[in-house]
Structure formats: structure tokens, C-alpha cells
């Protein structure tokens, strides 16, 4: 037995006779899992065989008793090397299973524990009476029974239940007789009880009052019992039980109120053994407040009954008592100044590999008193900005690094080449077979070689070598070599010497030569023999460079491709001979295709420039030492993603060398080249490599444990020796050795989250490469990679001795941290690009347009507004942002498109004047287009200038123009006008690509980048990962545990992307690496735009970001303009016909019953959805200002529902007076008499949903001010309900576009429908659409029924929206034509009188490319046959058949041959 197991046996005082038995001879402790929260220890033991039942029970009882004394619960399981399936042993353990939770539930135990079991045909057979419910057993008990027997050491058993007729009859008879006896006894007992009762009954006396029940005393006793109750691990609960007590953390809470006013708190808790759903009821608000401690993240003790929830069908605790408890987090117990620094930690930005946010990583290090912590994500630095800000806040140094993928620029084909004629050389083509991949820990078992000259084998070498131990099954299975092959083999040193003699005066050749040569050299060195010095050719690299078009260059695929015999792959003699045959094929092709004749030419003339793409990746950790290093880091990340990306970002060594200033390098993990050299080539080779680095990394033995499973290291002692060797490498290379943790999650309990994430990648991922073959193949276990405290780290390295452990864990890591300077990752200021004379141009354009509209001199209200805005815009350096936006809008206008504004840019009058937005934020006003006379309404009585009555100019009689939406400038750039402007613009989707290219044209390609985004695993996706993990690895989780695991696995980086319209502009006096690295979106190296590596939000305060979004409204307006010739700018905003749409359908010439809605809102942007149509029906807007209100109400959160809607229904307020848009609050409060600053602050608090989150004192101050100025209470209460509000400028821009579209619906309907179907409709069904009103209404009814039953597909939902418009169009007297092979357009509907002709793209399954190809082909000539339509038009047989069914093809024959014969008949 192992020393550790023996120590445990001493502690539990296991009897000596049992300890000396054969069962304990090779006993070992594989692992101990400690759950600190629930004080549960899980032991995992290894034994040679399943223990005798008496021995097992003794071990179990002594473990339980010993640890109970320390208030620790214990569970254990056994892995048995050999399993005895004898009936007696199985029966004993089967019955033992019912003594352990969860199999010990009363119902399960009573029904199944006494059944007999046997082992037949590799199955455990349970003989059961026929009345036992087999399905219930399989669904509720079988998984637990399998799990328990597996824990006893029997492995995963297949269990079948068979019906035993004899047992059924026997038990039935017993049941009947016992039931009769029970009935008889019950009758007799009842009679005797009655007699006794009468005898004991006292004489009748006056009734005395019963003693008063002491509720307080009972409650105190119940509370005392709750405090002392035994805590049950959640994993043990499998059935309904009463008075169970849990302790754990709340991870999800939902509070609901029933119609009767009762409250229910549904919450979920975990103790990290499992998770549970819980419920707590409260009768009123007062009782509800008693349970405020039930909050996310709280640690609670709860008691209640476990019952099956009738709705969820899962076990749920109905909570009776609850108490908040203190949770003792792990702490770093080392004294101040003696704490380690973690230098290798991954965050959730390590793609699909790590869990912690950078904030949580830094917070944990700071909480433990560490002075610094490093961030080293895989190949990216996307956590840097958040890490930078969090570290500054936490007062801790952040060390910025990454774990890079280093490759050699050019991987040589030949090592140590000399001037030699390849045709005249003699070659020794050799292969070795080994017991593993480590030259230091595994053994040579075969060396075979073929000596070849001019393609002929002239001599062969083949020797087996006895490693001195039996071969593993895996080695035998892989190589075909058995222990019999090795019997009588020569000693290793003899074979090595003989092979050296065999190789003299030859070029050595091997496939993947670095492995074979490394193994040979390590063995030569170990036996004091000279290493290989002659030239070596690697046929793997030879093939990669000679045949780059091949996907696979392994020996097997190559031999198949070139028809070279390979009968027994992975036996050295066969592999060597096959490699030799391939070599001479390669030499021939190299000579004929590339003129290569000399050995030196292989590397100089054949190795490709991009051979780094196939080079083996080695990990290295790179750290930023200073500001120069930060920029170099950004350059390296950019180059690895842009220029050297191949599967993963790669950094060629020469590129790293060129940018190494300000950077420090570590040797990384077991995938680093120094660790690999120690393992495969020896210390000397590792020392040579280590000189390249600044320090050597060593990691806790637990991190290297998977290497044991992969047979790269033999055992724990082997791991410790490798670590000692790495320390020796550091000593000889004069490099410090630092202990790092390779952190991938923070707490030990979080290991399962990473397991789920990593396993979701499938077996194609390297980390999931399997061990073994066939059905038994499993991925190697993941290492224990939590964030370790200094104490835990010192314990991991205790085998080094106290002083050395302290040096590598504490002293050296602190010294390294001291070498790192503070750097500025994120700039503190805004850096806008430079445009010559931007300030003068913005001012000039503004006044020029203002003078044109309002005259010179300007009205005071206009002059003051412009002066106020320009002071802010020019004074804060924002002029270039305004000018850039103006240039983009102007270019799009010149191409014939309107550009709609988004957000609050319409709050800026300067933006209006220079043409960025159509929205005029001034108070409602009249202005004369002839003499520029103006009138402003500033008392708040009018909500929008468009609602002013028409009237002529009093000076010249010209009809006034009306404008002004009364929006304060403060809502755009803040009260002080210094907020960075965020100008969002809606370009036509058709023109958006051109607008993007305009940015490049204006600022330059090297300064314009798409705004990058980072996509993470969503909880729904994580849920799928958990269910997949359950399926693939035989796990069984209750619903609450699935939810917990999904939440834990969510948030991990999965991919990158780009903002749909965001473009970041770098100032032209700096370069992009001053702000961020760059990359391609989603690693798509064919993309036309590069993106910022950082999420654009991380740098949006530092650089200009232009939102150039694509939108349908400008496209629709352009289409309508093309069809009608009407300039959309001339369409009035107060057209009576358009406004009539909001109150009825008469203007359309139809009834509400005909089109299924009481207003004409169908298909109108902003107002056509069911939700907004309902709002219109309730409010009946009649003015532009009220439409703005509706727009704000529909886009806000908690602004309409439960707020304004109720106020209007109850007659407290009207649509005009409720709070609709955010800006209205400031304007209304200023009109009420509040100071502008306070009005602005109240608006900001309300619009962000902060009204109830600010301090009561602050809120009461605002309320008092509002009441002093007669603001009604309903208005104040409404403010408190709002979570988010829509900007009025945004609403104005959208409503203006909507009214223009509506204008065409009223006055030019066929054009409107043509534009709608061409641009907005998402789904078509031509057979229905052209089938007339009855067909359309029937299909709509069909979808309506499906919707009620939740059966409608997304396509059907989209189709319903289309059919609503089709129905309206048909009811208005217009028609839908059929698809016409020679008249239909590819993608747009065509107008023919009162009929619309659909395009080809409207046919289901016919894409844009095929549609365009059909149109192009018909221009070249008529389609004479269906075959020709398929061939020239590119239509599939299915599409042609569909066209034929719809009578689109007429009498078109199948092929041209038939059409020729038609002429004769």
C-alpha cells in the first residue's frame, strides 16, 4: 500500500489483520476532494480487487467515526483493478447498497433490498416479483443503484430486472395472509382499547380550562432544534422527505405576488454537491421583509419538507425556517510581505477554456493581500482594459501578459545538412517504438532501420529491447508489440552501439524526425554515447513542403496516396521500410519539380515561407514590463491574428525577437518547449532552450497529473522529479524559477464548470484527445487549476523542502513582480482624428445655414443656442466628430439617399444646421422661407412645431414653415457639454457599404477599423452544454443543478465579431497600437475589414467611433422616391390624410373588419407592430407631439405598461401629459420652475432607472423641489417606476420617416405596397398571395390557430405579417400577379397598372444569385426547355418543378429534343 494510504489507516486505527490482507497490498489514495462549504470529504481509493464485505464495512465505519469527531462528513468510492462477480459477493454488496444514501430511502429499501441478484452475460440480473413497477425502478432508482455499486468497485454495471413468477406467487400469498392477520388483530385491539378507555374514564366533573399553550416556548424549542440539526448534503436527497436542513449559497431568486396578495420566493441554492429548488411563502409585505436575506450570493441554512412540485415535477423544498450564515471563504494565511504572486492566470477571455472574469481574479488576489497578479489569456489580451481599471480600483498591480503560441518561422526539412549529392547518398531510414512519448520517462522497445542506396534496400537493422517491465495494454494495442517479442532481447546499450555503427557515413531519415532523434539522443546521453551528428532528413516536413495541397501528411495517409505497402503501422521495421520507399518518391519529385539535387537545397529552396502554418506550436508566457512593451505586445497580438493566423494566432520566433523590447518571457506550462525538452530530450537540451527565456515556470504537481494518465510521466514521483529537473535547468541556465498556478478558475468547486465548457468542444479539440482506443477511450482528466493561496502553493511544493519551496513560490514571484512597471493600458483622454480647419468649417457651416433659414442677424434664441453649442463642441475638441458625420451624411445624400439620425444627436441644433440630422431641437416655431421672419413658442404649450396651425407670414404673406421639437442640448453632451458625442446614423442598407468605405476614404485605411465585439457563451447555450455533458458522460443532474452548472459555464469567450455599423477611427497623428491590437472578426482571414481586438466599448472614451448603421427606412424612402418622383423632404409632417390613419381605416377605403384592425397602422414603421397598434387604439393620437409620446412610450421600459397606460385609463393624465420621452422630463420641470441643473439631474436619474436606487435623502430633495413647484404626485410616482427612456430626438427622427412612408400608403398605395414587399417583407408564399382574398384569409386563420397553440414557426410568423399587408392591398382593390418567367425582376416587385408582379426571389427556396442568373440568362435568349432553364438559369430541379406546378412555365417541354418534334405535328 502507498505511504499516504498507510497513514490514513493509522489514523482510523484499521485492524492489522485486515491491513495485512492481500486486499490491501496495493491500496492507494487516488484523490481527496474537500468541499469546504458542506464540510464533506470525498476519498477515491484504488485496490487490487473488490474488498470482502466485512473489510469494506469495517473501513466504512472507522472512516465515518474518525472524521465525525472533527465534524466532517466522509464518502468514498473504490476503483478495483480486478472484479469478482461471484453471486455471494454481489448479493452482499447489493444489500449493502441499501444502507447508503440515496438508496436507503424507505420505499426503495423495503421494496428491493431483499431481492436476489446474479451475474449473467455481463449483466447484473435482479429477480423481482411481477407487480414491481419496472419503469419506476429504471427512472427513479436504477441510476442510484448503478452509482453505488460503482462506488463499491464493481465498475459501471448493466442491470436488468426480470420477473420471477415463483416469487410473485409466494409474496402474494404472504401479503394476503398477513393482511388478514392484521385486520383481525386491529379489530381485537380496537375492542380492548374501548374497554380500557371506559375503565379509565373518570367521573364527570366540572370542566376546567386547559393550560394555555406557550407558543413562544415552542418556537424557541423549534429554533434550537434548527440550530443543532444535522446538515444534509443536497446530493443525498432523491425522494420526498420531511424536516431536511440544507446549508448553501443562493444563486437564483425570483419573487412573485399572487392575485390574492400573497408572496412567493422561488430560489435555488447549492452546497456544491448538488443544487436544489426551494420555495418560501409570505402572507403579506411585512412577512416578506423578514426574508430579505434570501438574495443572490447569500449563504443560508434552511429547513423544510422535500416535496414534488406539481408544476415543475421536480423535488422542491418548502422552506419552514431560514437563517443567514457566515461563509468562510478561503484565505491566504501567510503574513504580510510573505505572500506569493500568481503569474499565470486565465480569465474568461481564454476562448472556451477558463471561467473567472478579470475583475473577480483581481478582487480575489487583492482580498488575499497579494501585491500583484498576472493575466495570461491564451493568445489574446481582451481582458486588459477591464483588468487595468479593476486593478487601479483595488489598489493592486496588474501584470499584463498572455500565453502565446510560438512557432519556428521555417521548420527545416534537414538538420545539420552538408554539401552532398542526394542521388549519390546512402540513407539509413529508421523508426523507433517506445512505451510512451517521454524520452526521460519511457523506454525504447524497438529500433528498426533500412539502409538504402538509390532506392534499394542494401541492409536492414531490427532489434527489440526489453524495458524491464511488462508492456501496458495501450502500448501493445498501438504497436502490436507484446511481451513475448521482447523476451531474450539484447540490452539497450548493446543495441544503441550496434545502431550507431549501422548508421555511419549515412544520412539519417525518419518521419517526424524530431521525436525519433530526440529519443535516440536522450538514450545515447544516458549511456555516455555520442549524440547524432550526421545529417537528418525529416520526411514529415519534406512532405508538407513538397505537397502543401495535401491535408494530411502522416505516414498512413502518405503510404495510401503513393501506394506504398504498410502492413503493420506502428511496428518500427514496417514503418522504417515504408518511410524509405516514400523518401525516394519525394527525392524524385523534388528533383523533377523543383530542381533540388543537393542536401543543402532542401532547406534553402524547398522550405516554404509559410511553413510556420504547419509548425508545432509551443507555449510561452509573455509579460509587459513597461509602456514600450505594451505597444510591442499589441503589435505581436495583431501580427499573430492578421498575418500569421493558422487555426490559432501564431507568433513566429523571429517576429517575437523583433518586438521583444519591454517584454519578459516565461517558459509556460507542459506545452512549453523547455518542459517538453526536459521530458523528451534531457536536461542539456532544456538548458540550451531555457537561455532564450527570462524565467522558468514550474507548476503544482496536480497541474501535471494528466501527463501520468497519458503515460508521459509514470507517477507522482515522476512529476516531482520533472519539477526538480526544471529547477536544475534554471540553475544551470542562470534563470530564476517561479512557481505559477496555471489558474483557470478561482475555487476548487468550479472545476466542473470548466469540465463542461472544455468537453463541449468535442474530441476534435486537442485538450479532449482520448486515452485508449475503442469504446473505452476517454479524454485525459483536466488538471486541478484553481487559484491557490500561498499556503496551498507551499504545500504543493513541500517535497522540495521548506526553503526552496518558499524561494520558488514566494520570493522569486515577488522579485519578478517588482520588475514590472506600471503601464497605461487605456488612455485617459479622447484622441480625435485631425481634419484641417475642422473648427472653422463646423462654425461656418452652422452660421451659413442658420442665416439662410432665420436671417442675419439671427433671432436671439437661435444665436444664443448656437453660441452655447459651439462653445462646447469646439472647446472640447468635438468639431472633428461633427464634421466627419456631416461629410458622411452629405456623401450619402449625394448618392440619392436620406440618412436618419438615431439617439440624441437631434438634440444638437448645430447638428441640424450642418445636415447631420433633420430633427430641429429648438422650441416650436414659425419661420418664413422668404423674409426669414420667425415666431417662437417658448411656454411649453405646444409639443411640436409641426402641430402649429398653418398661417401666413405677417410681414410678407408667404405661408410660414413650421418646425421645432423643444429638445435641450444637455441631453446630448451632458449638462456641462463635455460628454463625448455618440453620433448614430441610419444609412440605407443599400448604401451602408459605401458609407463604410467613405470613412476609409476620409481618414485612411490604416486609421479606420470596424468596432470589435467579443461573443461569450450565453446561458441557453451553456444549458445545452450541460445536457450534452450529462448525455456523454453518464451524469444525472436535477433541474436546479443543471441551472447552476449552466450559469457557471456561461460568460466564457466563444468567438469575436464586429459591430454591425460601428467604425473606430484612430487619430492620424498616432497609430492603432497606441490603443488596441487589431484582428479579423471571428478569425475570418478573408474578411475585408479588420476590427479592434478590444471590445469597442473598452476604448470608446478614447477614440472616435462612428455608428454607420443600415436601416430599411432610408431604403424604403429612396424606392418610393424612384417610383413617384416625389422628393420626400417636401412631404408635410401634418398631412390630414396621414393623421387619419391613426384614428380609423376610412382613409384607406376599407372597414376595420376587412383588414382586421381598427386603424390604418399596418406596415407603418414604428407603429405597425401589435404592441404599438394596441397603444394607438387606446390613445387615438391626433398630433405629431402625441406620436412622439407614443414612440417614447413604446421603446421605454416600464414607461407604458403599469405606468402611463394606467394613468390614461383612469383619467389622471392624457397622452399629451404623461412622461413619454426622457427629454420631456427636463423641459417639463424647467417650465414648472425647477432650476435647469436639478431638472437635468432628475431626468438622468429617471431615464437610467436609478430613481429608487439613489439615497432616500437625495430622492426626497428632488421630490420636495417638485412639489414646491406644483408638480403633481402622479408625475413623481411615475418617475419612480421607469427603468429606461427613449430620447425625444430619436423618436422625432423615426416618426418623421414613418409619416413619409404613411404618406405614400394613403396617396400612392400601389407604390407603397411595391416598396413594402420589395424591402420590408421577410417571408412570401406566392401560391397564397396570388390566390385571392379567400386564400389569403384562410392561410391567416390557419397561422392564427397555430399561434394560439404555440405551433407557428418563425417563418409562419413572418409570413402572417406579410399576409396582413397582402390582405389590406387586395381589400383596397389592388391585385397580386403571378411570377412571370420573362417579366419578373430578380429581387424587386414590379408595378403593372393595379397589379404587382412578384420577383423570382419571392419563390421559396430561390436565392438572390439564382434569381439574378435567371434574369441574365433570359436576356441572352428564350428558355426552350426545362433542361435549359436548369442549365442556363441555374435553377434546381426542385425549383423548376415548383415553377411548373404554379403554371409559370406554361407548356415548356422537358428538353429541347421534344420541342423539335413538336413542329411536325
From Swiss-Prot:
Q: Which InterPro entries match?
A: DNA_pol3_alpha_NTPase_dom, DNA_pol3_finger, DNA_PolC-like_N_II, DNA_PolC-type_N_I, DnaE2/DnaE/PolC, DNAPol_HHH, DnaQ, Exonuclease_RNaseT/DNA_pol3
Query: Which BP terms in the Gene Ontology apply to this protein?
Result: DNA-templated DNA replication
Q: Cellular component per GO? A: cytoplasm
**Catalysed transformations (reactions):** DNA(n) + a 2'-deoxyribonucleoside 5'-triphosphate = DNA(n+1) + diphosphate
Kindly state which keywords UniProt assigns to this record, in alphabetical order.
Cytoplasm, DNA replication, DNA-directed DNA polymerase, Exonuclease, Hydrolase, Nuclease, Nucleotidyltransferase, Transferase
State the superkingdom: Bacteria
The catalytic activity of this protein is classed by the Enzyme Commission as 2.7.7.7
Tell me where it resides.
Cytoplasm
A Pfam family assignment: DNA_pol3_finger
Gene3D superfamilies, A to Z: 1.10.150.870, 3.30.1900.20, 6.10.140.1510, Metal-dependent hydrolases, Nucleic acid-binding proteins, PolC, middle finger domain, Ribonuclease H-like superfamily/Ribonuclease H
Q: Per the database record, which ranges form the Exonuclease domain? A: 427-583
Q: Which Gene Ontology molecular function entries are recorded, alphabetically?
A: 3'-5' exonuclease activity; DNA binding; DNA-directed DNA polymerase activity
Q: Per its database record, what is this protein's job?
A: Required for replicative DNA synthesis. This DNA polymerase also exhibits 3' to 5' exonuclease activity.
Q: Which HAMAP family match?
A: DNApol_PolC
The family annotation for this protein states: Belongs to the DNA polymerase type-C family. PolC subfamily.
Protein name as annotated: DNA polymerase III PolC-type
Which organism is this entry from?
Streptococcus pyogenes serotype M12 (strain MGAS2096)
Question: What is the phylogenetic placement of the source species in the record?
Answer: Bacteria, Bacillati, Bacillota, Bacilli, Lactobacillales
- Gene that codes for this? polC
Amino acid at each position: 500500500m502507498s505511504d499516504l494510504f498507510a497513514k490514513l489507516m493509522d489514523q482510523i486505527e484499521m485492524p492489522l489483520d485486515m491491513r495485512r490482507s492481500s486486499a490491501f497490498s496495493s491500496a492507494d489514495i487516488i484523490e481527496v476532494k474537500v468541499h469546504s462549504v458542506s464540510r464533506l470529504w470525498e476519498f477515491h481509493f484504488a485496490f487490487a480487487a473488490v474488498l470482502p464485505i466485512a473489510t469494506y464495512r469495517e473501513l466504512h465505519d472507522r472512516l465515518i467515526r474518525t472524521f465525525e469527531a472533527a465534524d466532517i462528513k466522509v464518502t468514498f468510492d473504490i476503483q478495483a483493478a480486478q472484479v469478482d462477480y461471484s453471486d455471494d459477493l454481489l448479493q452482499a454488496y447489493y444489500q449493502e447498497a441499501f444502507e447508503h444514501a440515496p438508496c436507503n430511502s424507505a420505499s426503495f429499501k423495503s421494496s428491493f433490498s431483499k431481492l436476489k441478484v446474479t451475474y449473467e452475460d455481463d449483466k447484473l440480473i435482479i429477480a423481482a416479483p411481477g407487480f414491481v413497477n419496472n419503469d419506476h425502478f429504471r427512472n427513479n432508482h436504477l441510476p442510484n443503484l448503478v452509482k453505488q455499486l460503482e462506488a463499491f468497485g464493481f465498475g459501471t454495471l448493466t442491470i436488468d430486472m426480470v420477473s420471477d413468477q415463483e416469487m410473485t406467487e409466494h409474496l402474494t400469498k404472504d401479503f394476503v395472509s398477513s393482511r388478514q392477520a392484521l385486520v383481525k388483530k386491529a379489530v381485537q385491539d380496537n375492542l380492548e382499547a374501548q374497554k380500557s378507555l371506559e375503565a379509565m374514564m373518570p367521573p364527570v366533573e366540572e370542566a376546567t380550562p386547559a393550560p394555555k399553550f406557550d407558543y413562544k416556548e415552542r418556537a424557541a424549542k423549534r429554533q434550537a432544534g434548527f440550530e443543532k440539526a444535522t446538515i444534509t448534503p443536497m446530493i443525498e436527497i432523491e425522494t420526498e422527505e420531511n424536516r431536511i436542513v440544507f446549508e448553501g449559497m443562493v444563486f437564483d431568486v425570483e419573487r412573485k405576488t399572487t392575485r390574492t396578495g400573497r408572496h412567493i420566493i422561488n430560489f435555488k441554492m447549492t452546497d456544491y454537491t448538488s443544487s436544489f429548488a426551494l420555495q418560501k411563502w409570505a402572507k403579506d409585505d411585512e412577512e416578506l421583509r423578514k426574508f430579505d436575506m434570501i438574495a443572490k450570493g447569500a449563504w443560508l441554512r434552511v429547513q423544510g419538507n422535500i416535496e414534488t412540485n406539481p408544476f415543475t415535477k421536480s423535488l422542491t423544498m418548502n422552506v419552514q425556517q431560514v437563517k443567514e450564515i457566515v461563509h468562510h471563504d478561503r484565505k491566504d494565511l501567510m503574513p504580510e510581505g510573505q505572500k506569493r504572486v500568481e503569474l499565470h492566470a486565465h480569465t474568461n477571455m481564454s476562448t472556451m477554456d477558463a471561467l473567472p472574469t478579470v475583475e473577480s481574479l483581481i478582487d480575489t488576489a487583492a482580498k488575499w493581500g497579494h501585491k500583484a497578479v498576472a493575466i495570461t489569456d491564451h493568445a489574446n489580451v481582451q481582458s486588459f482594459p477591464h483588468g487595468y481599471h479593476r486593478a487601479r480600483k483595488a489598489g493592486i498591480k496588474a501584470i499584463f501578459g498572455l500565453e502565446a503560441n510560438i512557432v519556428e518561422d521555417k521548420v527545416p526539412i534537414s538538420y545539420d545538412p552538408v554539401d552532398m549529392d542526394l542521388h549519390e547518398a546512402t540513407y539509413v531510414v529508421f523508426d523507433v517504438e517506445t512505451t510512451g512519448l517521454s524520452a526521460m520517462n519511457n523506454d525504447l522497445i524497438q529500433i528498426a532501420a533500412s539502409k538504402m542506396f538509390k532506392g534499394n534496400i542494401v541492409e536492414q537493422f531490427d532489434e527489440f529491447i526489453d524495458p524491464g517491465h511488462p508492456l501496458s495494454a495501450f502500448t501493445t494495442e498501438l504497436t502490436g508489440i507484446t511481451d513475448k517479442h521482447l523476451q531474450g532481447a539484447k540490452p539497450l546499450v548493446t543495441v544503441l552501439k550496434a545502431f550507431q555503427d549501422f548508421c555511419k557515413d549515412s544520412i539519417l531519415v525518419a518521419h517526424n524526425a524530431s521525436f525519433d532523434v530526440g529519443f535516440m539522443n536522450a538514450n545515447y546521453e544516458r549511456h555516455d554515447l555520442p549524440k547524432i551528428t550526421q545529417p537528418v532528413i525529416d520526411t514529415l516536413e519534406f512532405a508538407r513542403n513538397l505537397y502543401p495541397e495535401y491535408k494530411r501528411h502522416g505516414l498512413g495517409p502518405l503510404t495510401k496516396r503513393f501506394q506504398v505497402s504498410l502492413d503493420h503501422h506502428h511496428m518500427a521495421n514496417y514503418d522504417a521500410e515504408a518511410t524509405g520507399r516514400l523518401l525516394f518518391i519525394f527525392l524524385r519529385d523534388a528533383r523533377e519539380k523543383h530542381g533540388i539535387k543537393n542536401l543543402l537545397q532542401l532547406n534553402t529552396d524547398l522550405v516554404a515561407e509559410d511553413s510556420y502554418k504547419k509548425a508545432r506550436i509551443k507555449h510561452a508566457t509573455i509579460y509587459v514590463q513597461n509602456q514600450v512593451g505594451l505597444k510591442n505586445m499589441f503589435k505581436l497580438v495583431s501580427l499573430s491574428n492578421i498575418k500569421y493566423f493558422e487555426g490559432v494566432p501564431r507568433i513566429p520566433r523571429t517576429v517575437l525577437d523583433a518586438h521583444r523590447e519591454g517584454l519578459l518571457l516565461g517558459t509556460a506550462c507542459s506545452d512549453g518547449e523547455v518542459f517538453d525538452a526536459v521530458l523528451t530530450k534531457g536536461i542539456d537540451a532544456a538548458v540550451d532552450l531555457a537561455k532564450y527565456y527570462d524565467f522558468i515556470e514550474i507548476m503544482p504537481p496536480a497541474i501535471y497529473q494528466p501527463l501520468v494518465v497519458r503515460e508521459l510521466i509514470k507517477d507522482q514521483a515522476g512529476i516531482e522529479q520533472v519539477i526538480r529537473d526544471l529547477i536544475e535547468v534554471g540553475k544551470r541556465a542562470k534563470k530564476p524559477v517561479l512557481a505559477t498556478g496555471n489558474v483557470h478558475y478561482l475555487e476548487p468547486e468550479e472545476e466542473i464548470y470548466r469540465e463542461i465548457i472544455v468537453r463541449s468542444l468535442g474530441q476534435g479539440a486537442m485538450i479532449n484527445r482520448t486515452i485508449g482506443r475503442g469504446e473505452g477511450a476517454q479524454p485525459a482528466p483536466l488538471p486541478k487549476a484553481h487559484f491557490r493561496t500561498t499556503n496551498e502553493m507551499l504545500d504543493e511544493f513541500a517535497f522540495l523542502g521548506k526553503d526552496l519551496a518558499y524561494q520558488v513560490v514566494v520570493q522569486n514571484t515577488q522579485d519578478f513582480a517588482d520588475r514590472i512597471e506600471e503601464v497605461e493600458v487605456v488612455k485617459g483622454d479622447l484622441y480625435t482624428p485631425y481634419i484641417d480647419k475642422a473648427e472653422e468649417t463646423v462654425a461656418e457651416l452652422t452660421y451659413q445655414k442658420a442665416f439662410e433659414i432665420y436671417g442675419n442677424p439671427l433671432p436671439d434664441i437661435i444665436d444664443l443656442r448656437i453660441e452655447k453649442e459651439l462653445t462646447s463642441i469646439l472647446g472640447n475638441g468635438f468639431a472633428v466628430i461633427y464634421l466627419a458625420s456631416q461629410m458622411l451624411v452629405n456623401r450619402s445624400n449625394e448618392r440619392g439617399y436620406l440618412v436618419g439620425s438615431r439617439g440624441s444627436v437631434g438634440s444638437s441644433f448645430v447638428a441640424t444646421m450642418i445636415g447631420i440630422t433633420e430633427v430641429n431641437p429648438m422650441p416650436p416655431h414659425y419661420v418664413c422661407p422668404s423674409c426669414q421672419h420667425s415666431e417662437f413658442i417658448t411656454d411649453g404649450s405646444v409639443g411640436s412645431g409641426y402641430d402649429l396651425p398653418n398661417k401666413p407670414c405677417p410681414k410678407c404673406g408667404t405661408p410660414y414653415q413650421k418646425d421645432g421639437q423643444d429638445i435641450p442640448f444637455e441631453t446630448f453632451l451632458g449638462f456641462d457639454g463635455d460628454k463625448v458625442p455618440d453620433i448614430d446614423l441610419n444609412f440605407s442598407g443599400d448604401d451602408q457599404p459605401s458609407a463604410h468605405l467613405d470613412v476609409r476614404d476620409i481618414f485612411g485605411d490604416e486609421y479606420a477599423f470596424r468596432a470589435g465585439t467579443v461573443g461569450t457563451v450565453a446561458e441557453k447555450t451553456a444549458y445545452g452544454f450541460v445536457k450534452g455533458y450529462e448525455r456523454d458522460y453518464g451524469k444525472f443532474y436535477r433541474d436546479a443543478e443543471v441551472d447552476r452548472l449552466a450559469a457557471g459555464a456561461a460568460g466564457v469567450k466563444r468567438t469575436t465579431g464586429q459591430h454591425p455599423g460601428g467604425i473606430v477611427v484612430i487619430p492620424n497623428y498616432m497609430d492603432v497600437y497606441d490603443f488596441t491590437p487589431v484582428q479579423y472578426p471571428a478569425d475570418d482571414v478573408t474578411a475585408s475589414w479588420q476590427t479592434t481586438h478590444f471590445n469597442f466599448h473598452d476604448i470608446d472614451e478614447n477614440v472616435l467611433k462612428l455608428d454607420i448603421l443600415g436601416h430599411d427606412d432610408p431604403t424604403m424612402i429612396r424606392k418610393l422616391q424612384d417610383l413617384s418622383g416625389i422628393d420626400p423632404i417636401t412631404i408635410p409632417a401634418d398631412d390630414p390624410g396621414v393623421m387619419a390613419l391613426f384614428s380609423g381605416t376610412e382613409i384607406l377605403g376599407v372597414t376595420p373588419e376587412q383588414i382586421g384592425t381598427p386603424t390604418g397602422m399596418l406596415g407603418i414603421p414604428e407603429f405597425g407592430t401589435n404592441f404599438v397598434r394596441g397603444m394607438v387604439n387606446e390613445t387615438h393620437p391626433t398630433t405629431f407631439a402625441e406620436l412622439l409620446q407614443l414612440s417614447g412610450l413604446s421603446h421605454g421600459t416600464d414607461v407604458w405598461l403599469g405606468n402611463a397606460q394606467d394613468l390614461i385609463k383612469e383619467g389622471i393624465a392624457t397622452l399629451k401629459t404623461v412622461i413619454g420621452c426622457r427629454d420631456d422630463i427636463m423641459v417639463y420641470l424647467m417650465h414648472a420652475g425647477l432650476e435647469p441643473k436639478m431638472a437635468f439631474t432628475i431626468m438622468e436619474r429617471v431615464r437610467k432607472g436609478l430613481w429608487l436606487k439613489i439615497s432616500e435623502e437625495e430622492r426626497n430633495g428632488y421630490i420636495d423641489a417638485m412639489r414646491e413647484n406644483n408638480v403633481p404626485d402622479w408625475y413623481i410616482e411615475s418617475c419612480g417606476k421607469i427603468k429606461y427612456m427613449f430620447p425625444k430626438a430619436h423618436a422625432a427622427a423615426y416618426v418623421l420617416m414613418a409619416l413619409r412612408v404613411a404618406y405614400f400608403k394613403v396617396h400612392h398605395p400601389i407604390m407603397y405596397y411595391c416598396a413594402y414587399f420589395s424591402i420590408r417583407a421577410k417571408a412570401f408564399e406566392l401560391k397564397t398571395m396570388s390566390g385571392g382574398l379567400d386564400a389569403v384569409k384562410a392561410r391567416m386563420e390557419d397561422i392564427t390557430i397555430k399561434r394560439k397553440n404555440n405551433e407557428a414557426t418563425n417563418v409562419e410568423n413572418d409570413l402572417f405579417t406579410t399576409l396582413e399587408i397582402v390582405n389590406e392591398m387586395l381589400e383596397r382593390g389592388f391585385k397580386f400577379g403571378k411570377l412571370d418567367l420573362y417579366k419578373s425582376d430578380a429581387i424587386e416587385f414590379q408595378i403593372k397598372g393595379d397589379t404587382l408582379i412578384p420577383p423570382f426571389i419571392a419563390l421559396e427556396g430561390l436565392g438572390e444569385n439564382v434569381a439574378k442568373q435567371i434574369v441574365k440568362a433570359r436576356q441572352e435568349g428564350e428558355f426552350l426547355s426545362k433542361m435549359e432553364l436548369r442549365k442556363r438559369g441555374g435553377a434546381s430541379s426542385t425549383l423548376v418543378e415548383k415553377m411548373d406546378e404554379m403554371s409559370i412555365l406554361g407548356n415548356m417541354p422537358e428538353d429541347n429534343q421534344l420541342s423539335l418534334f413538336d413542329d411536325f405535328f
